Amino acid sequence: MNLKKITALMIGAVMAVSMAVPAMADDKVETVTDGKLTVATSPDFAPYEFYSIDEDGNPSLAGFDMDLAKYIADKMGLELEVIPMDFDGVLSELSQKNVDLGMAGLSPDPAREDAMDFSDIYYEGGQSFVTVKDKADKFTKLEDANNKDYSIGAQTGSIQLDLANENTPDADIVSLPKVTDIITELLTGKMDGAFIETAVAESYQKNYPDLEIVCDVPYDTEGSAIGVAKGNEALLKAVNEAIAD
């Protein structure tokens, strides 16, 4: 699913609620809790998932992962339950089958395939190396970050952490549980650079113009998929059908 289709999904989310067709009885999908679709997410990953202030002034989950989760649940005739947690918690809960889906801008890394199944790609994105404007001239190319004098960040348990270890093994690599923590470290000068998913980096850059996206980071498996509880073929099929719509 490309970005244009994701945008259309967000605009049509309200329509999808009324138009959704519940799953037929003979196509019943087993879930962690009967009648519910339980989704784990890490709401520090705008524009995928984040906290937004609603009309009553209260924080509520938003983002196109959340719109997609709602669409899938409605299409299956299930109530949506979203459980926020750190990113590594999403991976852990899904691998233990405590939740049905993990939606947190997941990359379908082959190293994760023993712990979960992956849906089809629903958004094609990339990876970026990010710093602040005052330090941008230090990183004219990605190789410049591979220096023991630099502190380089990435989210704990993420593909970005793998990319940091692969591309900057000589640097002081720091893993933090939330992307918001990484952004804070960059802006306060405690961290020199970081590996961040491109759409996420662009989203933070809109709010924090001191951030600078220096370059793209090569990565073979570019794109985001939904993590599905391992072995639940019926659920995986239902998720892929929703993505294809």
Label the model's feature ranges.
Residues 124-133, 198, 202-243:
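Periplasmic-binding protein-like
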Residues 66-75, 133-135, 143, 149, ...:
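Extended ligand-binding regions for polar small-molecule ligands
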Residues 77-79, 95-104, 149-151, 178, ...:
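Alpha-to-beta junction loops
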Residues 78, 89, 107-108, 119-161, ...:
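A conserved helix-loop-strand patch within extracytoplasmic ligand-binding domains
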Residues 64-66, 81-93, 137, 174-188, ...:
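Short helix-initiation/N-cap motifs at beta->coil->alpha
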Residues 50-56, 69-77, 142, 159-177, ...:
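Ligand-binding cleft/hinge of the Venus flytrap
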Residues 88-89, 106-115, 162-166, 187-220:
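A ligand-binding cleft/hinge motif common to bilobed small-molecule-binding domains
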Residues 27-106:
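Extracytoplasmic small-molecule ligand-binding "clamshell" domains
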